Amino acid sequence: MITGGTFSLGDFSIGAAATQVGDVVDDLGGATAITLSARLGYGSGGTSVYAIVETSLDQGVSWVQIARLDFTTSGAQKVVTVSGLTPRTSAATAGTLSADTALDGTIGDRLRATVVSTGTYAGSTVLSVRANVR
């Protein structure tokens, strides 16, 4: 079990419209909070791109979305913190989070990022996603 640290969830090259799934960072059992950072290094073109960060409560069999960070056609960085200590008094619904939202109260033992883009980006556009786990 990793007790904390900063982990890369991927550096995604953005070109034609696509969905990309990053590598899994696992062995995070015991995490109580995660600060997520997504940075779009914008080149040119494109329409929209967003990163969804997911966690798993069943060793990667299924995934729960815990944050979504959205970008359009300019470089930017967005940061959000998700707490595993926030009580959930109602069941979270699996599915798509709305733009620029997060879901507190749910942190599993692994994370991954999924990046979805529309339009065609060019000029070495990259979306980088990091997680600081504690």
Language-model features: locations:
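Surface-exposed, low-hydrophobicity beta-strand/loop segments enriched in small/polar/acidic residues
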Residues: 1-134
